């Protein structure tokens, strides 16, 4: 996990490593408790591991660590988000949390899935395509 202090931060030195997904999950819940003044002040996170002493850029990515995330915007579930996600992703373990720009009128959220291994940089594009094929459909736009 690489953390960025805001959308304007591109320094990659703030890393957190976890022994398992449960530890990562616990950290996600702790991050969710951090207050922020506006969306621009919200902490950002990436599954990417970057080359040492570089900035946030695709050219500096070494791999994705043991998790991935799918952003979901413009999703209409008739107030039954939990039920829809449980039905669509019952076979997967995941964490769902709202993003900084989410509102009751326009919910936006992220689904975070554990991976069984890291994704080397050369496989990220293929993995991303497969992940989006797997998660899109009638339940997720």
Model regions and ranges:
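Signature for HUH/AEP ssDNA processing cores
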Residues: 1-107, 113-125
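Flexible helix-coil linker/hinge segments at domain or subdomain boundaries
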Residues: 132-141
